[in-house]
Amino acid sequence: MSSLLRRAGAKRIVALTHGHEVWWSKVFPFNLIMRRIGKTTDSLTYLGEFTGSAIAGALSRKSSETMVKIAPGIDTDHFKPLDSKDLRKSLGLEHKKVIVSVGRLVHRKGQDFLIKSMPLILAQVPNAHLVLIGQGPYLKHLQSLVTKFRIHENVSFIGRIQYQELPQYICAGDIFAMPSRSRLAGLEVEGLGIVYLEASACGLPVVAGASGGAPDAVIESVTGYVVEGTDTQQISKRIVELLLDEELRKKMGDAGRQWIVKDWRWEIWAAKFAKLLAG
């Protein structure tokens, strides 16, 4: 493809990666394809430290030295702290400590272990409530877990919502949690975890899973915590700590918002990408 583009007049070719290239880089023959892409382009982008390291393993040393970090930026005018009192009231959450989680309902996103952690959380925070936003093939299994633990009154399934509504729903939470985990011997992982950054932009502390590049979206103990996605003790400990400490929640939420505005705004990454294209 690159040779055809150059014959057509392309002077500079940059290949963008999006996260799934991590497993490409580990599996034959896709790793050879990645190596060829690296050799025939002027630069290859990566999302964060985890994806950069994984992809570099499939490239030649020369190609890996041309890699540049280009991450998806966050629209901080869209994702920002909002007053969600009316939404909380409409959802029956006025007097609840709300854990909000946004993501496709699939195995590796960790909604199952959030539900499994709820009995431990409720033992210390009786008014805790888990709000799951998203849809996916794991829905029936998650609903069966809610039935198993008899926590129907403590878990809400919202389903899919519109992008325009997302900040309002995130801000309806006291904290954001998605304890994602890696699967298939590390081939199925989080490339970065944009939703953690969106939650930070909304001023919420986050609890993220130690899967792939998800930790790149959290400053540990500053904007939130990283936990093992299958450890209910770790998950519940961090969630309880945040739900019981309003001052800590505000401190981490404010730090997260400041970090996103400083380092993750889409304008910043657009400018870096334009510079990369210009050479």
Where are the regions a protein language model picked out?
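Conserved donor-binding/catalytic core segment of Leloir-type glycosyltransferases
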Residues: T45, L93-K109, I115-M118
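Acidic donor-binding loop of glycosyltransferase active sites
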Residues: R160, C171-V189, L204
